[in-house]
A protein has these predicted regions:
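Intramembrane alpha-helical segments
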Residues: 1-81, 91-103
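Alpha-helical transmembrane segments
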Residues: 61-168
Length: 168
């Protein structure tokens, strides 16, 4: 499964969707192309697996993705196609979340599984990279744009770090 994730992660940099500027994070702006490829692939793998690993509790992964993708829809609202895609995914996630959390009562419980959580992780990673590529926010965030994008995915990523350190 991890090998397939690596191939999927390589797809974005090969389509020139990669991080090429850290927007002043740690005082670094422009980075070499090879570093952008590596950073992009690592970021995608971390985000995809972070979303996948938090899918064990009913409503957690879908609820966080609703919040994350709604924020990216606002952040990327100048690009109407991206904002519409986010809105459509959020709309379907709200319905999924309802049946995932409250479906036990009526016997209509559904679950996401690996395919759903990996897809959501990839979408979140794509939106994160897209938001870091250039100033496309409704209000130009400048150097804060990197921190906004990182903050949106902080909970799932820190959970992965916590689990990795706990299992040592």
């Amino acid at each position: 499964k991890f090998v397939i994730q690596i191939f999927a992660a390589l797809f974005l940099p090969l389509c020139n969707l990669m991080i090429s500027d850290l927007n002043g994070l740690f005082g670094i702006h422009q980075i070499p192309i090879w570093a952008g490829y590596v950073l992009t692939v690592v970021l995608i793998l971390v985000i995809v697996n972070a979303i996948n690993l938090i899918d064990g509790i009913d409503g957690l992964s879908s609820g966080l993705c609703i919040l994350i993708l709604t924020a990216y829809a606002v952040l990327l609202s100048k690009n109407h196609a991206i904002a519409s895609l986010n809105t459509a995914i959020v709309g379907s996630l709200i319905v999924f979340w309802f049946f995932n959390v409250f479906g036990k009562v009526g016997g209509l419980k559904i679950f996401m599984g690996d395919a759903g959580s990996l897809f959501l992780g990839y979408v979140c990673a794509y939106m994160s990279i897209k938001s870091l590529m250039r100033p496309i926010a409704p209000v130009d965030c400048g150097e804060e744009q990197m921190m906004i994008s990182i903050t949106l995915l902080l909970i799932p990523v820190l959970d992965v770090v916590r689990v990795a350190l706990q299992r040592r």
